């Protein structure tokens, strides 16, 4: 295992560092301290490096990136309806950065922080450990929240991402990494990328992408990924009902042993399995690297955001995102690469 550190540049008059984790197979994970960003997850196949995610080549591409490209989201990923919620008898008002709702932790959330970083290394793992304390003055959420995000690469080509947090007052905590995958050979589009999900329901969303509270079966619809299916095939079925994209929350079965989702290429070269200890997966089609193609919905990236179901604070059956005062919590997301 090897860990290197280099200067990535400067944002907001802060020096941003880049950490690269490399195992003996040549698999690399690069992390930027700005936004706790996963800049690279790549593997070596037959002597050629192949990226598994969609990325930007330099720091400038991650400065207020509208896609939150492979960046940390928090304190709460997804949207909070009305930019407010009730907690311990008090109404908490957040900044409505997506009027009239709050989105992805707000304009001063995890994405817009330059995290402190250290590293850890063992015989078969390499880690970068990112820490930050969020205050109510920063993001309007209650409590001073101490958060640690740890990226760990193993010799088995598994990337574990852990989120550890503790607050001095009750608050909300539902973080994720907004990772955009494309595991196909040339990463040009999603025509040859298939997806399989562990669940058979999705949330009904309104026009602002706020959950209505209803869960509906996916069987037989364009949202049915109970068996491996290309993104293109699913989109083609959605088009028949006037839909043009995936920007949806799926109900999945949390598990450390069974993937909540698997992504592969139809040539059979590679797969990535996603594991999570939470019950939601937001799936989003995009093209973060080509605005012209994005305008005509020519997608080359599939965001897979593992989290508790969005807007859970307003829906008791979606899961518990309340973090009581002085109580530690940990969540884990894992990506397992397999050469086929």
Curated annotation (Swiss-Prot):
Keyword Isomerase: yes
Tagged with keyword Isomerase: yes
GO biological process: galactose catabolic process via UDP-galactose, Leloir pathway; glucose metabolic process
Pathway involvement of the protein, from the record: Carbohydrate metabolism; hexose metabolism
Keywords of the record: Carbohydrate metabolism, Isomerase
GO terms under cellular component: cytoplasm
Signal sequence segment: none
E.C. number: 5.1.3.21
Biotechnology: Available as a commercial product from Sigma Aldrich (catalog number M0902).
Pfam families, per the entry: Aldose_epim (PF01263)
GO MF term list: aldose 1-epimerase activity; carbohydrate binding; maltose epimerase activity
Top-level class of the enzyme under EC nomenclature: isomerase
Binding site for substrate: 79, 247
Reaction equation(s) it catalyzes: alpha-maltose = beta-maltose
Active site: 178, 305
InterPro entries membership: Aldose_1-epimerase, Aldose_1/G6P_1-epimerase, Gal_mutarotase_sf_dom, Galactose_mutarotase-like, GH-type_carb-bd
Recorded family membership: Belongs to the aldose epimerase family.
Function, in words: Catalyzes the interconversion of alpha and beta anomers of maltose.
Protein name from the UniProt record: Maltose epimerase
Annotated organism of origin: Levilactobacillus brevis (strain ATCC 367 / BCRC 12310 / CIP 105137 / JCM 1170 / LMG 11437 / NCIMB 947 / NCTC 947) (Lactobacillus brevis)
